[in-house]
Every structure is written in structure tokens, then in C-alpha cells.
Amino acid sequence: FENKFFSDNNFLHFDWVSQNIIECQKILNNKSNHLNIFKTHSVRHKKFTNETVNAGFIYIVRDPRDIVVSFKNFSGKKFDEIINELIFQKKLMINTNGAKELLSTWDLHVQSWLNYNTVPRLIIKYEDLKLNPKEVVLNIKEFLNKIHKLKIDLSDQHIDKIIENTNFNNLSKLENQNGFDEATKYSKFFRSGKSNQWKDILSKTQVQLIENNLQTSMKYLNYI
């Protein structure tokens, strides 16, 4: 894990990185005693969030080989360009609805959150969301109860409804009907959602390049 990359100097030129982000989280948290849930695509850095404003986090990770396939359709870029960004572009930025976020490489992104161990965490693999949605929902419930002393109690009917409402096919239908802010001119946002598409799409050379460069984190997450 390249700790040197996460030094202050490497983050100073990103205008979103400042103490204002921490202060914003403090203000939002102080507005109510309820649990606030924030979504981000960013790598984790001490100037982005910390234990003074963060009770815990849920990190959703996906097989980088499938990310390449998904992002190719989403961005309109070529496979090799996306693979290069995924592996080597440490300062890769995205702009989400006007907000800049630092993605960095897949490996640095994963490690930045896995090494954030001063608050409780729940790591969820995208593939498990597809295969075992009920188990994942129960894990999320228990995690939220733990970090905020909640008393969420879900019946089987509640769980089934959650799974139905968040089912990929249902979300895709809703996007067809109502649109979705994060869709692009190249692709709808909820396009396919399948796992292991890379096996039929990426070349052997492309797969080897990804696996050779990301093998430590991929092995840790049992992707290889």
C-alpha cells in the first residue's frame, strides 16, 4: 500500500480537499441526532473524513475486470484506456453533478478504505449483493444497529420488499421510465449489472495485465 501517495502534498492541489469537508460533515451531523448516511466515490484520506465525524462506513467493492467492462460502456472509452486508468492513474478525477471526486487507481482506492481501521466498517462485494441479497441486507441492518445503537428490526416481508425495490432489473425499468442523473450519452446507468462479463469480453492479455498489477488486493478479496 503506497502510503506516500496519501501525504498532504499530493492532495493540496485538489480543490475539494480542505478542512471544509470535515466541517460540513460536522454541521450536518449536528443538525440532528439521526444517523446521516453519505455516499461517495472518493478514495479515503484524513482530510476527507475521520473518526470525529464518521461513526463507520460501508464499502462496496467490485471485481476490477468487470469494472473495465462496465466503464467502457458507460464512458465510451476504449478498453485499454480504461485499464490504464484503473491500474496507473493515481490522480484520476471524476466530476459527479458538479462535485469533484478523486477515484485514483482501483488498488489505491480499495486500500485507502481497507486501511481505515479507526471506525467500524462493513465490506460488501458487489457479487455478494447479486448472489446473497438477503444475507447482505441483514448484515447492513446489524451494522447500522451496532454503530448508532439503532433498533432496526426487519421481518421477512420487509427484507423481501427491500430486495424487490433494489433489484437491478427493477432499477433499470425505473431508469427507462424516469431517467437517472448519472447516466451518460453513451449508456444508461443501470445497463447490465451482471458479474463475470469480463470472461467473455476481455482478451487474455488484458486480463493478465489487470491481475498482475492488482493481484495483492484481488487475492485479499478472493477475486483471484
Task: Indicate residue ranges for each PLM-predicted region.
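PAPS-dependent sulfotransferase catalytic domain
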Residues: 1-124, 184, 189-224
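An amphipathic alpha-helix signature
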Residues: 65-68, 134-141, 156-160, 207, ...
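Acidic/polar loop patches that form or flank catalytic/metal-binding clefts of enzymes
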Residues: 149-157
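Short, solvent-exposed coil/turn elements at secondary-structure transition points
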Residues: 43, 63, 127-129, 165-168
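Short acidic/His-enriched helical or mixed secondary-structure segments at domain edges of catalytic enzymes
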Residues: 161-186
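PAPS/PAP-binding and catalytic site of the sulfotransferase fold
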Residues: 1, 123-150, 162, 170
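Short linear loop/turn motifs
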Residues: 157-164, 224
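Polar helix-capping/helix-linker motif
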Residues: 116, 155, 167-170
